[in-house]
Amino acid sequence: MLPMITGFMNYGQQTLRAARYIGQGFMITLSHTNRLPVTIQYPYEKLITSERFRGRIHFEFDKCIACEVCVRVCPIDLPVVDWKLETNIRKKRLLNYSIDFGICIFCGNCVEYCPTNCLSMTEEYEFSTYDRHELNYNQIALGRLPMSVIDDYTIRTILNSPQTKNGENPLI
């Protein structure tokens, strides 16, 4: 009789422990109902990038003095700068400037150390292509400014900060 009573007590304790674990999981599930969804519908919705986002590089041909500082500070010697020395004025004349974004690691050193600020980072991050040679941008392609995500009326923009439905930020 005694082993039967202890067996029922053990069964009751295990049942209570299982119910407590199920209750804990249910409480976690309920706490997540107050949060905004994490996923977005990508082609139709895009996240607004921060100001310091390092996207595609924008190049201004007229400002460049062909000093090649960008090549020297690049960890992979990526920018290709072709120039010609003008002997009559003793200055370099820029002929061609290109960057292969298939190799670029987007470190931002070229933008940071450029003495004339002819390089800047944009918010463009979509580089999908079927041919890797299309990722090699010359000065004409680098000079085009991409359309801002905020200005594109076909895309719904979403702030890139975790918030709850009540509007409070849980990280603060």
Swiss-Prot record:
What sort of enzyme, by top EC class, is this?
translocase
Please give one Gene Ontology molecular function term for this protein: iron ion binding
The Swiss-Prot or TrEMBL record lists the needed cofactor(s) as: [4Fe-4S] cluster
A GO cellular component annotation here is: chloroplast thylakoid membrane
Q: What residues bind [4Fe-4S] cluster 2, as annotated?
A: 74, 104, 107, 110
Provide the protein's localization. Answer: Plastid, Chloroplast thylakoid membrane
Q: Which Pfam families match?
A: Fer4_9 (PF13187)
Q: Relay the cofactor remark from the entry.
A: Binds 2 [4Fe-4S] clusters per subunit.
Q: Which reaction does it catalyse?
A: a plastoquinone + NADH + (n+1) H(+)(in) = a plastoquinol + NAD(+) + n H(+)(out); a plastoquinone + NADPH + (n+1) H(+)(in) = a plastoquinol + NADP(+) + n H(+)(out)
Annotated [4Fe-4S] cluster 1 binding sites: 64, 67, 70, 114
Q: Which residue range or ranges hold the 4Fe-4S ferredoxin-type domain?
A: 55-84, 95-124
Q: Which domain of life is it from?
A: Eukaryota
Q: How does it assemble?
A: NDH is composed of at least 16 different subunits, 5 of which are encoded in the nucleus.
Recorded protein name is NAD(P)H-quinone oxidoreductase subunit I, chloroplastic
Q: Where is the organism placed in the taxonomic lineage, from the top?
A: Eukaryota, Viridiplantae, Streptophyta, Embryophyta, Tracheophyta
